[in-house]
């Protein structure tokens, strides 16, 4: 192996033959990943790197048989470092791969939804199948928060949805597969466990105004069946960054206006990402926006998430889950846009929780 001196990003899987490739930014070329004895572990890490929850299958192909298909050369895995790696890109480097055999992998699908393709104030009614990962988290039958399906049995949401007064798990239900809250066609499942981030300070000090790490995972009592109206969302790949000004969509059944009624039908609204420099300005939030948060909305207000949208998704056109609705001042106020948790900054936390807490029950904390 050569020293890992190349800048790497943008892993991808070919839709034709499932070959796994990594873009070498230094050379401006795509490289194949040389097959090894650790293909199963590498396949899992590869899928995580791209934002998928897990690998479903893997195999090896021979470049002399199937061709290079626009790729140029290989990366090899340092198998000694692999068991301790959180990112595949940390343990690969350019190599010769003399056998010419490379990894192909199939990841759990995500992001499928019906097209065409507004806590939502100023939004519009959504239609069935447009946001099939959206769930309603209900306590004693009442909608409290939104969430997003990551798999058939894991939901990503906000930690602040689970204060001490709402921790009897038998009273929680997860509702999905419908856009109307009173739809008889949606599915409702019980909750086995809630794992919230141990760094969410308001759970340690009720007077804390620090809202970083506002993230939690809900493990369902049994897996949901995937249908046209129930699908998992895609997590961001390891190297995907938020782009200031990019317009994405926030969805939820939250209040239609501040202290107003909750939406009976799922709402959707398109809002632009605001830079943290602007959002931390004295006229906005005055340095309350921490590195793992960001703002989205319009400086003049009018369109925003609101109470009851917390925990729900902020998704871009590529069906990649960028953030979780976290907090804000009022709803749709001028210079007080919605504040969101950056999901990409918690990828390793998400994967670790799912790997280590599949048998857990009750309320669990995980740093």
Model regions and ranges:
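Extracellular "complement/coagulation-type" protease architecture
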Residues: 1-310, 315-367
